[in-house]
Design a protein with these regions (language model features):
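Short acidic/histidine-rich motifs immediately flanking catalytic phosphotransfer sites
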Residues: 4-9
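Venus flytrap/periplasmic-binding-protein-like
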Residues: 10-49, 53
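Hydrophobic alpha-helical segments within soluble ligand-binding/sensing domains
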Residues: 1, 37-44, 56-75
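Generic hydrophobic, helix-prone segments enriched in Leu/Val/Ile
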Residues: 2, 24, 41, 99-107
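Hinge/cleft segment of the Venus flytrap/periplasmic-binding protein
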Residues: 67-139
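Alpha-helix termini
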Residues: 3, 27, 47-48, 75-80
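Stable alpha-helical elements in mature extracytoplasmic
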Residues: 16-20, 41, 61-64, 99-100, ...
């Protein structure tokens, strides 16, 4: 419906490329999205009208998985004030295919940022908040 109104641009928060890419490209309407660095988003930024993508690494859930595994195994990790852990992972932004490719190649199913080796560093009996925070900050 929004595309039928002939907008000059289209802004989406998640999955515009999944549902609207074909229609937006055919109509010549530039669009932006907050989504992941996926193959289809790469095609949209290279050959289509996707002009801005803010995304997270596909493996960004890795540290949360590590925190849960630690808690299950008896190492409940808290911050310095005794609160539940809160970590921030910034969005990566691509406005062209070259930048997109850099992020996509650095984190995909075959080569995740939070690989098994990385997760092994933050899962264990002696892991602390500082350890997990350092690993997340370095990625």
């Amino acid at each position: 419906a929004a595309i039928q109104a002939a907008p000059e641009a289209f802004i989406s928060v998640g999955m515009a490329t999944t549902f609207f890419t074909q229609q937006l490209n055919a109509a010549g309407i530039e669009f932006s999205d907050i989504d992941s660095f996926t193959k289809s988003n790469g095609e949209a930024i290279t050959n289509g009208k996707l002009v801005y993508l803010a995304g997270k690494y596909s493996s960004s859930v890795g540290p949360a998985f590590a925190l849960v595994m630690n808690a299950i195994n008896g190492n409940v990790i808290r911050d310095a004030q005794g609160n539940a852990v809160s970590l921030s992972q910034n969005y990566q932004v691509a406005t062209d295919s070259e930048t997109f490719d850099k992020f996509y190649k650095n984190d995909n199913g075959d080569n995740p940022i939070y690989s098994r080796d990385t997760l092994d560093q933050i899962i264990g009996d002696t892991v602390t908040f500082d350890t997990i925070n350092e690993v997340v900050a370095s990625n």
